[in-house]
UniProtKB/Swiss-Prot annotation:
Belongs to the small GTPase superfamily. Rab family. Keywords: GTP-binding, Nucleotide-binding. It comes from the Eukaryota. This is Ras-related protein RabK1. GTP binds at residues 14-21, 61-65, 119-122. It holds the Pfam family Ras. InterPro entries: P-loop_NTPase, Small_GTPase. GO terms for molecular function: GTP binding; GTPase activity. GO terms for biological process: phagosome-lysosome fusion. A motif (Effector region) lies at residues 36-43. Gene3D superfamilies: P-loop containing nucleotide triphosphate hydrolases. It comes from Dictyostelium discoideum.
């Protein structure tokens, strides 16, 4: 059993005021509040037990706009939470921008897994709200384009009523832990390379003998 404490980095992206900080605060066990704009980015720590091992979560949040140090925010991410307001058309249309932002700030050969979250489900849907059918179509389109490695997990949440917050983060953490383990495995495979055989000249020097040809 690996006794090393695992630290998972989970970032949250999406437009301003869609409720990103509220769902993080809810998951942290803090009461719902109508939060204003946060600083460019902040992070929170939480320890949980999953599969009989303690895991440390580092939950990062950004206020929803580009900034100079975005590379820091996206570095070494294990899972990304992409949020939109199910009653806000623009936040839904901007999802593709955030997906491209994620791709642009991570390694070329690395596809960071993400979970899609629709916020403010406590408010009744109207004709201007984003229908579940449109959301399913969007997910299928992203999957068909090969932007993600696996099927997209989608949750509709309410920080106000604590709806689906725990369920969403259970999935997020499992995905992040799997990504973490895969990265560790790949890192070990890269570092363990067969030693190249020494040339004749190197062997002779090691033996204290030098021949000139």
């Amino acid at each position: 059993m690996d006794n090393k404490r695992k630290l998972l980095k989970i970032i949250t992206i999406g437009d301003r005021m869609v409720g990103k900080l509220s769902i993080i605060k809810n998951y942290m066990g803090r009461p719902f509040f109508q939060w204003g704009n946060s600083i460019p980015f902040d992070f929170h720590f939480k320890e949980i037990i999953i599969d009989n091992e303690t895991v440390s979560l580092q939950l990062w949040n950004t206020h929803g706009s580009a900034y100079e140090d975005s590379k820091i925010y996206y570095r070494d991410v294990d899972c990304c939470v992409v949020c939109f307001n199910i009653h806000n058309e623009q936040s839904f249309n901007n999802l593709i921008y955030w997906i491209k932002e994620l791709e642009a700030n991570t390694l070329v050969d690395e596809k960071v897994p993400f979970v899609l979250i629709g916020t403010k489900s406590d408010i009744e849907r109207t004709e201007k709200s984003i229908s579940k059918e449109r959301i399913e179509q969007w997910c299928k389109q992203i999957e068909d384009q090969g932007i993600v490695k696996e099927k997209i997990h989608y949750f509709e949440t309410s920080a106000k009523l604590s709806t689906n917050i725990i369920e969403a983060y259970e999935t997020i953490v499992k995905i992040a832990l799997n990504q973490y383990k895969n990265k560790q495995k790949n890192s070990i495979n890269i570092s363990i390379e067969p030693e190249k055989p020494k040339g004749i000249f190197q062997i002779m020097i090691f033996m204290g003998v030098v021949f000139y040809f």
